[in-house]
Amino acid sequence: MTARLFLALALAAAPALASLPLERVKLPPGFEITVFAADVKNARSMALGEKGWLFVSTRSAGNVYAIRHDGVKALETVTIASGLNMPNGVAMQGGALFVAEVNRVWRYDAIEASLPKAPAPVLVYDQYPTDRHHGWKFIRFGPDGWLYVPVGAPCNVCEREDPYASITRLKPDGSAMEVVARGVRNTVGFDWHPQTKELWFTDNGRDMMGDDVPPDELNHAPRPGMHFGFPFCHGGDAADPDFGRARRCAEFTPPAQRFGAHVASLGMRFYTGAMFPPEYRGQAFIAEHGS
């Protein structure tokens, strides 16, 4: 059996698609990579509906798309929302699509029953900061039923009050919000281990400390309330040149895994499927943007 990797691409025109050098992508034996959808400009995050529609967010384009497909390629792409403020985050729960802008979260109830026309959105929460610097949000529902929403630091490096530089969680009806993890500069990828149900997340390190420091991180948060160092300490052992005198690195939780500096570790997901070979199951897949 051939294992397929689908590439949802933000392409503006067919000529760009025709020239996409997929043959240059290095794959393990038995894997194949193909273009799944080409008309989803500025695609960022994805969420799969219960009836098979694929919902795709954007960052700068301000749109949210719904894609009808046959499991191999897109058949129809519908713009279900436009003019939003960096709607980077999408997540599904109970047949409803949740969309996160910079400072607020919307809910589209029973959306797949309404397509190709989207239902009117319901405002869930609008008390997140309005800063656009690291303000786009990747969102997911946790095993506890809460919606997890990161709030990035509004800077390269600075010390700000909650909820900046944190991962928060929000009740689906918006009735409560709380901080789960602190000292997180800018995470845009997290998941829960399929066996332990514990949270793991990537974090992007600060700039202007050099080409080789600090490392990007994969962090493990088995319980709420942990602090991962920002802005005082990076990578578990590198004191910040501006804020490091205030706190010691030993006070914070070090990363479970260090990556290269400035590789921009973004999406992160544990593989729980059955199509890939056994050695892939339960492993973390991490996408790096690169500097």
Annotated model-derived regions:
Residues 33-37, 76-81, 122-128, 175-181, ...:
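A short beta-strand motif characteristic of beta-propeller blades
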Residues 19-29, 136, 153-157, 165, ...:
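Beta-propeller domain segments
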Residues 39-42, 50, 60, 76, ...:
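Beta-rich catalytic cores
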Residues 48-52, 92-95, 141-144, 193-196, ...:
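Residue-level detector of Asp-centered blade-edge/turn motifs that repeat once per structural unit
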Residues 39, 48-49, 55-63, 99-104, ...:
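Conserved beta-strand positions in repeat-built beta-propeller and related beta-rich domains
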Residues 77, 86, 91, 103-142, ...:
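Asp-box/WD-like beta-propeller blade repeats and closely related beta-sheet repeat scaffolds
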Residues 23, 63-66, 96, 104-106, ...:
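A short loop-to-beta-strand structural motif that recurs across blades of beta-propeller domains
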Residues 67-72, 108-116, 222-228:
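Short loop/turn segments immediately following beta-strands, especially the blade-tip
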